[in-house]
UniProtKB/Swiss-Prot annotation:
Location in the cell: Membrane
A GO molecular function held by the record: peptidoglycan binding
Membrane topology according to the record: Single-pass membrane protein
Protein name as it appears in the record: Uncharacterized protein RP066
Length: 222
């Protein structure tokens, strides 16, 4: 008998032993048997003290059992108030007409006054708006347009950076004056804007800004 045959035989013997041992263990357990009980079924009543129970198989019916009521502890509520009877037939037709007219006249007068006041306010508001628009246009035409090239923390740094940008783009910023503007943060600190120009028209300022943006230089119209 070869070695392989011996190994196979030993393996079969081990597997058989494990299988029969497991079957013996399962058969040795006690068998559980369920027997029917002889207790009478519990049926909950559907009517308790002349009250029909909606859900018989719930615990609600247990709360419906009332106790003895003491008549001395019962509080009787008073009768409700009787409704008022208003007889409108005793009023004359003239009184009704007079009341209606006396009610409508103040409303008509107030509406007319309000309309006149509104018309006056509209005229005044239109005049104020036109004046503000014309003033803004005059200020813009006199001041011209500037181009923002950046922002820094100090005025000296702003002037130095502006000169550097002007030197970098001599053709675009030729004959342009570099200025600064002090601006306040919300937290109280300040920063400085680097501004170029003044350009007489918006289209001219936009053209300069487009050329700077094409050359990867930040630019904002002011």
């Amino acid at each position: 008998m070869t070695n392989n045959s011996k190994i196979c035989l030993v393996s079969l013997i081990c597997i058989s032993g494990i299988y029969f041992g497991y079957q013996y263990y399962q058969n040795s357990k006690p068998v559980i048997t369920i027997y029917p009980d002889n207790l009478p079924p519990k049926i909950r009543p559907s009517i308790i003290e002349n009250n029909q129970v909606a859900s018989v198989y719930s615990n609600i019916y247990e709360n419906l059992i009332t106790q003895d009521t003491n008549i001395q502890t019962v509080k009787l509520l008073p009768d409700p108030e009787q409704p008022m009877i208003i007889d409108s037939r005793n009023q004359s037709q003239n009184d009704k007409i007079f009341d209606r007219m006396s009610t409508l006249i103040p409303l008509i007068e107030s509406n007319n006054n309000a309309k006149n006041a509104t018309d006056l306010n509209i005229i005044k508001l239109e005049k104020v708006i036109k004046d503000k628009v014309s003033n803004a246009q005059n200020c813009r035409s006199n001041a011209g347009y500037k181009v923002q090239l950046g922002s820094v923390k100090s005025e000296a740094e702003a002037m130095a950076e502006g000169a550097k940008i002007k030197k970098k783009f001599p053709k675009i910023l030729k004959n342009v004056v570099i200025t600064t503007k002090k601006v306040k943060y919300d937290d109280g600190k300040f920063f400085y804007l680097i501004l170029a120009g003044e350009y007489s028209s918006l289209s001219q300022a936009q053209a300069v800004c487009k050329k700077l943006a094409y050359n990867k230089q930040s630019c904002v119209l002011k």
